[in-house]
Regions:
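Hydrophobic face of amphipathic alpha-helices that form TPR/SEL1-like repeat modules
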Residues: 1-61, 65-66
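Short, electropositive, low-hydrophobicity segments enriched in small/polar residues
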Residues: 49, 130, 159
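Residues in flexible loops and secondary-structure boundaries
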Residues: 49-51, 64, 74-77, 165-167
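Glycine-rich loop-to-alpha-helix module at the N-terminal edge of alpha/beta enzyme cores
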Residues: 57, 61-154
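Conserved small-residue-rich beta-alpha loop and adjacent elements
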Residues: 156-168
Length: 168
């Protein structure tokens, strides 16, 4: 059984709402240094900077350019699709134990960085801080829940008898 994050509810229960708001405000402030940064495409683990970019603006204040992202060419798009297919094939052969471990590691990392990630969600989607934190808490909870589900159901792989002995 997972223990839900419930960041805001915990802040209320421990009378630490001010600390919650200070952490969120601090995360917002630290992100301002990243505004307008140009990000690369990442295809097959390699960073590729494109000639053309587009701006991502905050919906709550469209004057703020949060980031610049590359416009992929047709060739880069095909490279990305092929890379994703290869990654899917690799992930498909990954044991359920390794998948569950990965889910938990991501959940732990998200939990450690929750105020920064929630601030990003708020800026990028225009959500208020409580909605953004709730979304992040839910993501962390789902990652942990599905890790538990994978393990309790042994990866959802059930070997059954075949009707025909030659059937695989």
């Amino acid at each position: 059984m997972i223990e839900n994050e419930n960041t805001w509810a915990n802040a209320i229960q421990t009378n630490s709402q001010d600390q919650f708001h200070k952490k969120f405000d601090s995360a917002l402030e630290s992100l301002k240094n990243e505004f307008g940064k140009q990000y690369p495409l990442i295809i097959g683990g390699k960073e590729i900077f494109a000639e053309k970019t587009f701006d991502v603006r905050s919906p709550s204040d469209t004057r703020i350019i949060l980031a610049k992202f590359p416009l992929a060419t047709k060739e880069q798009t095909y490279l990305a699709i092929n890379s994703a297919k290869q990654s899917f094939a690799k992930w498909s052969t990954t044991s359920y134990q390794s998948r569950a471990k990965t889910f938990r590691e991501v959940a732990d990392q998200f939990s450690e960085e929750k105020f920064t990630l929630a601030a990003i969600v708020s800026l990028e989607n225009g959500k208020n801080r409580l909605e953004a934190m709730g979304e992040l808490d839910e993501t962390i909870d789902f990652l942990r829940f599905y890790a538990d589900q994978l393990e309790s159901h042994k990866g959802f792989v059930n070997v059954t008898k075949n009707a025909n002995p030659n059937e695989k």
